[in-house]
Amino acid sequence: MTKKTGYREIYLLGILTFILMFSVTLIYPVQKEFVMERFNIVSLKETSLFVSVNLAAYVIFSLIWGSISDRMGKRKIFILAGFLGNAVLMFSLTLAPTMAVLLVLRFIEGIFTVMAFSLLMASVLDIVKQTHYGRGMGILGMGMAFGNAMGAPFGGKIGAVDPLYPLYVGSFMLLIGASITAIALKERKLESRSASLRDALLLLKEEKRIFIPYAFSFVERFTVGFFVVIFPLMLAIKYGIGSGSIGMYMTAFLIPFAFLQYPLGAISDRIGRVPPLIVGSLLYGIAVVSVGIVAPPMLVVVMVLGGVVGALMYPPSAALAGDLANLAKRGTAMGGFNLFGSLGFAAGPFIGGVVADRYGFQASFAVAGLAVIIIALIFFSSLIEINKKVSLHDKLLKNNR
């Protein structure tokens, strides 16, 4: 992949991603107590805005930060600012007097979160060789998934004592992340930079195929929006499960999802992005639909299986975005990947809340799962074509050696 120093840097980026994701997912198991009970909210749709406005900031700023970073040729300063700003804004959420103020603060917090996250992703692509994007994204994906897996149950446990505790702990952890960034993360000289923000916005026009991994990023994050908002509310409202146990149910999905990120990313480097992406998407869609049908305690089994097949999707889709982007647009490409992912993440909770309010939780998860399956079927032929071209290219390279 890289030299040993490159490995160390990628692992450091994975650790920072873990800290970031751990911190921002602490609050999810206690949304009922922190949002619904604190501000007397009864609608699932209105409650979902707590997550949706945060992710709306991701949508607006992910591509902007990637482009500015490429243009300046710097990553570290943006990652550091993202951690620090997120720490301050997360603490400020505990002081919000009204729901309206809370939503404004959540939006600003999202600006800093995506600043750190999108540039952590771009930094991995700066280090790894193109043939090892899958492994690089796998390491980053493990950091993200383990952060989610540990943040959710821990947030549920401490949130059962006081729903403000997850925010206090999250703010403190983000300060730790900022300290590690300032001390240990090196500023690398980028090989090239984007010419302008206009170039970033025209990236899809220049390389139309990059829309494929972007679409998978959208739908994968779309379903995650259901898991972080609608799923814990379903457990609390429909099944009467407490916040501590809600975190454990979320962990049943996230642990296998985390453990399999790196090995499946490495497999996609060897066999190609397309096979695991197609198979993972179809099976994952079925698993998501099943979440709304199967009741506890068997729901744990569905969550575990969902985590296994879900891990097939993320590394190859993120790596495919890196494969299709030219060197000058790596940061911009991953900013676009995050942009579409954030669109899905922002839309998921709101659409899930609307459907659940009107038709119930079972229909809500059916919408999420079918969305994944439909995207896989729409792009099936395009992915097969990409796979054929890659196989032919690899064969020609092998014959020329």
Protein language model annotation of sequence segments:
Residues 73, 95-97, 240, 272, ...:
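Helix-breaking motifs and short loop linkers at transmembrane-helix boundaries and internal kinks
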Residues 166-182, 365-381:
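Symmetry-related core transmembrane helices of the 12-TM Major Facilitator Superfamily/SLC fold
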Residues 77-91, 275-289:
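Structural signature of the two symmetry-related core transmembrane helices
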Residues 1-7, 187-216, 395-401:
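Juxtamembrane intracellular "pre-TM" segments in multi-pass secondary transporters
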Residues 35-36, 68-69, 154-160, 235-236, ...:
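Interfacial helix-cap and linker-helix signal at transmembrane-aqueous boundaries
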Residues 55-63, 148-149, 254-262, 345-346:
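Residue-level signature of mid-helix packing/kink "hotspots" within the transmembrane helices
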Residues 30-44, 229-244:
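Short amphipathic helix-loop junctions that connect adjacent transmembrane helices
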Residues 107-143, 319-320, 324:
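Cytoplasmic helix-loop-helix junction between adjacent transmembrane helices
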